[in-house]
Amino acid sequence: MPNYRRANQAGGSYFFTVVSYRRQPIFCEPAFREALRVAIESTRTRYPFEIDAWVLLPDHLHCIWTLPPNDADFATRWGQIKRRVSLSCGEQFRRDEWLASSKRKHREATIWQRRYWEHLIRDQQDFARHMDYI
């Protein structure tokens, strides 16, 4: 797995954008929403975080999380959430014609783009700007 440069700050607040694979408008499908809700609850049990804001759009989502003190590992949390959703409803949204060899090799579903965008919230003004955006 590549080692991406990430702005990690224990106890920090982060703004995320996560996009569906090929911008499929599946994020508002009832099965997806339920799988996402369950995945978030399950992940938060093992890896706690606060959800400050969340918006779910047809092909992407935005959210703001605050991590616990002494914890900056949002990547594990996103990995858990994406994995659980894929296991729960991946077959329903599977598109075999989209499975390139690299997606087959990594046993990926056709639900998520591989990466996501994150932004470390720097101060209260930055937090307010991102809350307004959501």
PLM features: what roles do these ranges have?
Residues 1-133:
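Short catalytic/metal-binding and nucleic-acid-binding patches
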